[in-house]
């Protein structure tokens, strides 16, 4: 229990929701294309989908997360969009020590699966951040606006030059689920780049093949990916994170496992509804 107290009172707990969002960060990166809005074939998700996850540290449940694709289409920049919201929060006794209640959302182009706008509402103990990111894919610009918590007015926006079809976490999540891994070989390396928290990243991801994985939501055949982690103060080594996606047409994140400097943590799928395709559950 002392290790749990240390974990929830640390800066790592303040960022625990990152474990839920990490599969989306992997997906945010893709090779560049020439078209402004290249069509991405999507047979993996639809409006009305709902995914629920639990976050744990060792044997202790510390939080839950949800991913929701809204029932109605939205419109932005005269383009039809999915509206997607991701929520992550601590639960139970952990709330008393380190209350986390985060919301991440985006308007995602239904044809190209790129974001037109994304937003974050971060509530982690006393720390608060409200941010809006606007994507202009025609001009290749990203505009970031952060709310001043005292005046409740947005600060001076910051504008970045962007590569074609740049994605955020949510847009990356949608894009990843359309990827075909059937022709990948074990230990293939995918070199990817994208935009997250005011920075552009390049990251290597290893494809480790397929295996059976059991989570609360059921037993699945899964695609296994391992990002090569850059040096940081949270995850223990470059091979510290593993991600499992369902090996079916839905390609939903099933599980994330992370070795941290102060213990092991993870995320797993607990329930789902509104999937576009029947899930391939194993007996």
Across the structure, where does each feature detected by a protein language model lie?
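Active-site/ligand-binding surface loops and adjacent short beta/alpha elements
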Residues: 138-196
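Bacterial N-terminal signal peptides
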Residues: 18-27
């Amino acid at each position: 229990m002392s290790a749990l107290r240390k974990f929830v009172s640390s800066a790592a707990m303040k960022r625990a929701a990152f474990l839920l969002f990490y599969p989306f960060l992997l997906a945010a990166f893709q090779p560049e294309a020439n078209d402004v809005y290249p069509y991405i074939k999507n047979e993996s998700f639809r409006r009305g989908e709902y995914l629920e996850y639990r976050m744990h540290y060792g044997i202790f449940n510390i939080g839950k997360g949800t991913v929701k694709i809204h029932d109605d289409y939205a419109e932005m920049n005269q383009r039809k969009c999915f509206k997607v919201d991701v929520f992550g929060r601590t639960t139970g006794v952990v709330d008393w020590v380190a209350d986390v209640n985060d919301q991440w959302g985006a308007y995602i182009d239904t044809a190209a699966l790129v974001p037109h706008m994304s937003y974050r509402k971060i509530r982690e103990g006393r720390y608060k951040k409200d941010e809006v990111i606007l994507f202009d894919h025609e001009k290749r610009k990203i505009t970031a606006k952060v709310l001043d918590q005292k005046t409740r007015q947005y600060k001076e926006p910051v504008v970045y030059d962007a590569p074609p079809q740049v994605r955020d976490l949510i847009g990356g999540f949608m894009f990843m689920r359309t990827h075909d891994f059937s022709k990948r070989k074990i230990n293939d390396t995918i070199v990817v780049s994208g935009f997250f928290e005011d920075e552009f990243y390049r990251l290597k991801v290893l494809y480790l093949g397929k295996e059976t994985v059991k989570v609360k939501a059921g037993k699945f055949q899964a695609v296994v990916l391992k990002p090569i982690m850059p040096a940081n103060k949270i995850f223990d080594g470059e091979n510290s994170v593993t991600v499992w996606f369902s090996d079916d047409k839905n390609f939903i994140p099933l599980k994330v496992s992370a070795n941290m400097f102060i213990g092991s943590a993870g995320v797993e799928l607990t329930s789902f509804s509104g999937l576009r395709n029947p899930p391939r559950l194993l007996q």
